[in-house]
């Protein structure tokens, strides 16, 4: 943010959230980390706090969908039997137009800010753990190994930079877990409601309803998208939605000769689309709590999920699917 004029600050916030979420593999973690900065930036520049927090949440959904250490990516590739790096390439090409247009929209809407963003001091050293995790994931290092490496590096950087003493390592880790308590409880309650929906046949009805209406390859892809989106509405958890619909999506993709990389990408994309605009989803609940606004106020400014859906539908309709040789 040091190098950006105030008019580009909201767009810069979106880019930072994209980078952090792709490195961390978690949208909720990204929102919790950047929400305070969004609030302070709004106060300093005069930008609407809703716009600022929406930029953070939109960027968070970018990484939640794309990151190779994200649980949604892992669930999608495991259920479809493809490689993470292959899914990443295809998924990236699908959502890139949406990300670019989103950036432009945030810049245009924020143009005319009058304040100055106070970025404070920063250290390149503290960025190293994020870069290691991001690069390690991109080159295909085992997820568990790269996450453990990132955690150890973060602790080393924290101690060497004076952020905390080595004797406080476990308390710092504990504080991180404790900070997620409220949203975890809410997520558990929503998951319980989703389990009740499944137990009483709601999810099975959705699956039958969608499958009966699939007749062509394009229809199959739209059906997969609708299926995972509907299940995410019911469960408010995109990972759970992908796991629950993964097997039926694989059956449909094999029947209609759809590339597994494409199916994995569509599952992840449309689960993220819905998750990003659910007022009772963990992401918007955490964003609204951090900014002190209603989730319903944020939803109209969640440009990225909307554009991601448009981009994916255009891809389905105009890009023929053929299985990888």
Question: Model regions: which residues?
Answer:
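Alpha-helical transmembrane segments of multi-pass membrane proteins, especially transporters
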Residues: 9-17, 28-35, 51-60, 73, ...
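Hydrophobic core segments of alpha-helical transmembrane domains in multi-pass membrane transport
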Residues: 13-21, 95-109, 126-139, 148-158, ...
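Short helix-coil transition sites and intra-membrane helix breaks within transmembrane domains
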Residues: 21-33, 61-70, 182, 195-204, ...
């Amino acid at each position: 943010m040091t190098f950006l004029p105030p008019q580009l600050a909201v767009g810069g916030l979106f880019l930072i959230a994209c980078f952090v979420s792709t490195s961390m593999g978690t949208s909720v973690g990204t929102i919790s980390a950047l929400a305070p900065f969004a609030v302070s930036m709004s106060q300093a520049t005069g930008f609407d706090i809703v716009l600022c927090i929406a930029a953070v949440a939109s960027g968070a959904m970018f990484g939640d969908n794309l990151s190779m250490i994200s649980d949604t990516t892992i669930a999608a590739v495991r259920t479809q039997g493809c490689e993470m790096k292959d899914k990443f390439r295809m998924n990236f090409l699908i959502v890139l137009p949406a990300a670019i247009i989103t950036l432009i929209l945030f810049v245009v809407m924020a143009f005319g800010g009058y304040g100055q963003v106070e970025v404070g001091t920063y250290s390149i050293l503290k960025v190293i753990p994020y870069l290691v995790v991001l690069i390690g994931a991109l080159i295909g290092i085992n997820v568990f190994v790269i996450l453990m490496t990132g955690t150890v590096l973060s602790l080393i950087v924290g101690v060497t930079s004076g952020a905390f003493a080595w004797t406080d390592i476990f308390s710092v880790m504990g504080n991180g877990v404790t900070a997620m308590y409220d949203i975890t409880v809410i997520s558990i309650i929503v998951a319980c409601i989703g389990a009740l929906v499944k137990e009483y046949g709601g999810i099975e009805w959705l699956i039958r309803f969608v499958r009966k209406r699939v007749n062509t390859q394009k229809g199959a892809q739209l059906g997969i998208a609708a299926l995972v989106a509907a299940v995410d509405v019911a469960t408010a958890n995109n990972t759970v939605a992908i796991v629950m619909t993964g097997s039926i999506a694989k059956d449909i993709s094999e029947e209609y000769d759809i590339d597994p990389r494409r199916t994995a990408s569509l599952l992840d994309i449309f689960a993220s689309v819905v998750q990003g605009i659910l007022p009772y989803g963990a992401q918007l609940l955490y964003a609204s709590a951090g900014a002190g606004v209603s989730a319903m106020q944020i939803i109209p400014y969640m440009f990225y999920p909307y554009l991601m859906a448009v981009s994916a539908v255009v891809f389905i309709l105009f890009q023929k699917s053929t299985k990888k040789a």
